[in-house]
Amino acid sequence: VGLLSRRRPTPPAGAVPAGGPEMDFPRPAGAGARQSRMPWRLPDEPAISGIAADAVTVGALTVRAASLVGPGHRCAEPAQHRQDAYRLGRDPGRRFLLAAVADGMSDSSRSHLGANVAATALVARLRADLGRGADPDGPALFLDAARQMSGMAAQQKVTENDVRAAALAAAVPVEPAPDGTRPVWLSWLADVSAWLRTGAGWTRLTGTDKEGLDQDVLTEFLPFHPGRTRTARVSVPPGAVLALATDGIGDVLAGGAAPWFAERWAGPPHIASFVADVGYDARGRLDDRTAVVIWCDR
């Protein structure tokens, strides 16, 4: 009787679609994409997970991170691997939150591996440099990641062209300066971006808005161009909300959905809600999407 009492009632016939239950993601721009309502498929080869997520507190920082395979990749048969990646960490002295976000290029057959190696290498090198008291060096950081990506390509018996990725690394002070601000160190290559929540929208801290017919064509990426890495130190105000994102999120923060995300991420949401936000459904937005959002003093 005890076992029977814990059984869920059998749903009526026809209650669940033949292809499985639909997964409804929020639609910040109204119309959704047809692919978002299609079943998720598997790649032919064993794959990294289609969804990765973390919810952590590091000192006075609250962090939500999520990476999802995009509708255009997950509904194909066979599906494509999630080509985005992120990593979180902290320095040995626990003074900095370290984060890296990487976006594998769709026309590189092993870019999912390249993105994961890049994100891991960037955080590891940042941690090592800060641990020995050195200032972060963007070009050296990205050169180290490029070498590891090249080594992985050789191990996989593929070319460096098969593992290309864009990337961004950040070091965020756990505690604020006496005036409440935080000097955030950022280093990036290509269109992975950093954003600061400002009122009902977002201000871009790294990268440039996409324009023209070739707006999605990258001319710089790892492992080929670590010397083109750009670096900035940005002072963020008390209570700031900082977002690090691949273009699957960055493109909508630059567009009409920016107020929706600003409202949703005014404070740290439950991780399940955050994953749903990152997995948003919008017509024409089919790419993988990744966001690491940091709330200061929350």
What does each model-identified segment do?
Residues 11-124, 192:
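N-terminal entry segment of metal-dependent catalytic domains or homologous docking segments
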Residues 205-207:
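Extended, polar/charged low-complexity intrinsically disordered and coiled-coil segments in eukaryotic
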Residues 1-40, 44, 152, 162, ...:
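C-terminal catalytic subdomain
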Residues 77-82, 159-165, 283-286:
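A short catalytic or substrate-binding loop motif that flags glycine-/basic-rich loops and adjacent residues
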Residues 108-110, 196-197, 252-254:
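Short helix/loop capping segments that flank catalytic or ligand/cofactor-binding pockets
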Residues 133-198, 229-235:
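Catalytic core of PPM/PP2C metal-dependent serine/threonine phosphatase domains
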Residues 100, 188, 242-244:
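Residue-level marker for buried hydrophobic side chains located in beta-strands
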Residues 120-154, 260-281:
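Helix-loop-helix
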